[in-house]
Amino acid sequence: MLYSENDKRKHESYRIPLFGSEEESTSIPKYVLKKEPMEPRIAYQLVKDQLMDEGNARQNLATFCQTYMEKEAEILMAETLEKNAIDKSEYPQTAELENRCVNILADLWNAPKEMSYLGTSTVGSSEACMLGGLAMKFRWRNNAEKRGLDIQAKRPNLIISSGYQVCWEKFCVYWDVDMRVVPMDKEHLSLDVEKVFELVDEYTIGIVGILGITYTGKFDDIALLDEKVEAYNEANEHQLVIHIDGASGAMFTPFVNPELPWDFRLKNVVSINTSGHKYGLVYPGVGWILWKDKEYLPKELIFEVSYLGGSMPTMAINFSRSASQIIGQYYNFLRYGFEGYREIHEKTKKTALYLSKTVEKSGYFEIINDGSNLPIVCYKLKDDLDVEWTLYDLADQLLMKGWQVPAYPLPADLSDTIIQRFVCRADLGYNVAEEFAADFADALHNLEHARVLYHDKERNDSYGFTH
């Protein structure tokens, strides 16, 4: 083929190796928009290189979020990235898939057939918690006005354990609600139900029960809480309700412990949220919230939106977002079915129990959560242990092998207790877990045979957790 000078310039860029390009030999603008465009292959590589030192997401044992999906799911989600989940009239079949997901969850959570349950997808459990909190606040306000209570006399309040996820603090700040916290102690590493009612008054909008505390993986005793709430409701005109923050547990427990009473089978549990991108096995981010009956979602929170020629009811804080995660959730429901989810979660639980025993056998640690209810392994150094290293040192050692395993203080009254926790997800197979166990043993050996420079025994670093 013969080339002219123009042809040479036209095709020159394709003859230059990627790392011989002009863009790779100069510093790219980082905080202002660059003037000229560049080839897509170069832009791709530059962005990929910027992310290179973040580590392997599958070795991130700090996160609950799903880090693996099947290729078919990835293709399907990539093919639907452009669909706007809010455009119900434009994408009616996508809306139908969302509706099916809500119905599947209602069945999974034992919503009474005689009631009119309803629900919606969200960006994640944080948004779902906000919606659940708003519904409780508005319903409390409506009922308080009917009882003649002066709703301006003091702020409404929400009761939750100190193991709460930060979205609840945000909810209370954003919507002017007093958050009344039941502190955890060494005897109660979940909600102390007896102390709940020391905080209840006529301005209480509801109580949050947590099915899988982010710090430890433990469950609040929802059945006992429901029993106590029922006794309170029988004796008082003001009626309490329970919202379940099931960000982690609500997509795990129905498959591995279906007999555990925590869901809509309990009379006073009126709403539940969960994260599809945790044990729903979908990439971030998708969440869900369901109400047991329409009476628990005040009508003033439901908007009829006229959009692109259609009218639709909506209850959300976010608006435009891709429908791909909703479609990914439906794919998983269709692909796995009940037995598929059960098998996956049982294997994940088996992995957690194996790692828990590995940690315990080392002799250094006291197990706080062994992964039998939720596959979260949580532990602390034994109180009588005389070592020069801390859990923060252990976290640093594991990070050298690529494993991200956080160490952090427990909240509030237990802030002097430092714990470490790792999350077992579906993609942490038994063979990979064996590799982690070997690296864990090596890390302990290195710490025991290294000279550790003096530092404070434990530093009260704080870690934020998000849905």
Curated annotation (Swiss-Prot):
It comes from the Bacteria. GO terms for cellular component: cytosol. The modification N6-(pyridoxal phosphate)lysine is found at residue 278. The keyword Lyase applies. Its cofactor is pyridoxal 5'-phosphate. One of its GO terms (biological process) is glutamate catabolic process. Gene3D superfamilies: 3.90.1150.160, 4.10.280.50, Type I PLP-dependent aspartate aminotransferase-like (Major domain). CDD domains: DOPA_deC_like. GO terms for molecular function: aromatic-L-amino-acid decarboxylase activity; glutamate decarboxylase activity; pyridoxal phosphate binding. It is an enzyme of class 4 (lyase). Keywords: Decarboxylase, Lyase, Pyridoxal phosphate. Coiled coil: none annotated. Transmembrane segments: none annotated. It catalyses: L-glutamate + H(+) = 4-aminobutanoate + CO2. Pfam families: Pyridoxal_deC. Its EC number is 4.1.1.15. Belongs to the group II decarboxylase family. This is Probable glutamate decarboxylase gamma.
